[in-house]
Amino acid sequence: MKLSDAKRDFYRKKAKKQGYISRAAYKLIQLNQKYKILNNGDIVVDFGSAPGGWIQVASDYVGSSGFVLGVDQREIKYDNKNVKSLISDIYDPEIHNTITNYLPKKADIILSDISQNISGIWDLDHFKQIDLTKRIISFFPHIMRNRGTAILKVFTGVEVDKLISRLKIGFKKVEIVKPHASRSKSSELYLVCLNYNSKVIEYLKMIEVEETK
């Protein structure tokens, strides 16, 4: 068995044994072990939630006083008292308003493990993933609180550095991480974005409006 296959099999078996919906749960667990971003009482929005591995982990960490909203076009299989599911397309022009209506207040944490169907064409998959991520970033001024945190999945490629530069305008720190639970051969990376500055974003939006007049 190849090393990457062995790792995938290990986490699949571990997920089944420990009662997690998917092996992807361990990616978020490992990210949280490093950054301690999920805490009791937090409000979380998780994009690309199906089947529910990340929601399950987030739900455990935020507890009964927290809230987790999962957003996906597919059915989300996990349910709990502190979890709601929104079956929707992120390109729906009204989705940020819909999400806002679901949330008790602006989110502390935004998670994105979303991806489209993989074509196997490296550049094509990379650019599609960047577009998805940019779409989610566009929601931040509407749904994320000041000093919030985001974790965003991207695929390696030429646009990653540009995206990080853009994110650093609104976040104090942006780091690239590949959790051990990710397959060795996978091109996926996670951008961990810490300490969101909503005032900077609002200022930039104002400047953009002025420039278009």
Regions found by a protein language model. Give the residues of each.
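Short glycine-dipeptide loop
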Residues: 64-65, 144-149
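S-adenosyl-L-methionine
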Residues: 71-119
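Conserved SAM-binding loop of SAM-dependent methyltransferases across substrates and taxa
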Residues: 51-64
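Conserved class I S-adenosyl-L-methionine
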Residues: 40-50
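Class I S-adenosyl-L-methionine
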Residues: 154, 158-213
